[in-house]
C-alpha cells in the first residue's frame, strides 16, 4: 500500500469563533495548497482515497488535492486525523478501506508522529513535517514502512509548475 501524508498549509493564528478546529488557511496557505495539489497530481500517485481531518485548515488543504487528482467523490473526513489522536487509529481505518494508495491530510504533531510510527514500525519516533509538505511511504500493513520521499511544499510547487 502507498501512503501519502500531507500536512495542512499555512493557517490563521486564530479563528473568529476562537475554536482551533475553525482556523482556516491564509491567502498564502490557499495558494500553497493549490501549488502542492498540482505537484502531487504531476507525480501521478495513483491515489484512490483521500482522508482528511475535519478541521477547516486540513479540509481546505485536501480539497485542491482532491480536485487535482479527480477524487472529489473520494474525499472523506475522519476524526482519526485530528491533532493529538493515536496514529494507530488512522492506520486501522486505512487497512479497513482495502485501497492500494491513500492520501492522509492532517496536522502536526500528529502527522510527524504517524510518519515516525510508520518508518519505525512501532510508536516512539516522530519525524516533523513542515506545512504543506508531503511524505510518500510504502507499507505492507504491518511492521515498518519504507519512506520513499519527503517533499517540502516548494519542491512540489516547482514540480507542478513544470508539468503545466
For each of these PLM feature ranges, what is it?
Residues 70, 114-125:
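A short, gly/pro- and small-residue-rich
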Residues 2-81, 85-88, 96, 125, ...:
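Active-site-proximal alpha-helix that buttresses catalytic centers in soluble enzyme cores
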Amino acid at each position: 500500500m502507498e501512503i501519502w501524508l500531507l500536512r495542512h498549509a499555512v493557517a490563521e493564528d486564530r479563528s473568529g469563533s476562537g475554536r482551533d478546529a475553525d482556523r482556516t488557511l491564509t491567502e498564502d496557505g490557499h495558494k500553497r495548497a493549490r501549488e502542492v495539489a498540482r505537484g502531487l497530481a504531476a507525480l501521478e500517485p495513483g491515489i484512490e482515497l483521500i482522508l482528511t481531518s475535519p478541521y477547516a485548515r486540513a479540509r481546505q488543504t485536501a480539497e485542491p488535492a482532491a480536485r487535482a487528482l479527480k477524487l472529489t467523490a473520494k474525499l472523506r473526513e475522519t476524526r482519526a486525523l485530528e491533532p493529538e489522536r493515536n496514529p494507530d487509529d488512522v492506520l486501522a481505518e486505512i487497512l479497513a478501506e482495502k485501497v492500494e494508495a491513500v492520501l492522509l491530510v492532517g496536522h502536526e504533531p500528529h502527522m510527524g508522529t504517524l510518519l515516525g510510527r510508520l518508518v519505525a514500525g512501532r510508536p516512539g519516533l516522530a519525524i516533523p513535517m513542515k506545512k504543506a509538505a508531503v511524505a510518500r511511504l510504502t507499507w505492507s500493513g504491518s511492521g515498518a514502512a519504507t519512506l520513499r520521499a519527503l517533499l517540502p511544499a516548494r519542491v512540489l510547487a516547482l514540480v507542478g509548475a513544470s508539468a503545466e
